[in-house]
């Protein structure tokens, strides 16, 4: 979800296109924030927010020329890489607070919209690296998130600091 928020806030997705509005997360984030601010209840059975996230993930993975999105095919949103997500549907009562916390920073009674545009690639990589240290599992019919010390090792996912990349490039490409 962080990558979708980042892509929208950086205008990497066609957020200014009317055709994209029906699938975008930004309007849903604002709507959820307004409703949370008013103390509205969210359904414990309906999964509209989940549906929006699932639809957008599928569109980004496969592309949809009718709304101006090419297939990205990076594998991040490929259903084969996230089989658990196809087996569940989180209700709005669960996802609304998550969307709200990812979208608004609170300082006392003030709420400030979080714009992911300002994240650097390094910060996004660092967040992703930390997320890789956890795994989502189903335990006795309940979905849980738990630390997994071997998750990054098993997936071969390691973040390489800029300084090391620069050094390797300089030494490798020297005449």
Where are these predicted regions, by residue range?
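Preference for the N-terminal adenyl/adenosyl cofactor-binding alpha/beta module
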Residues: 1-175
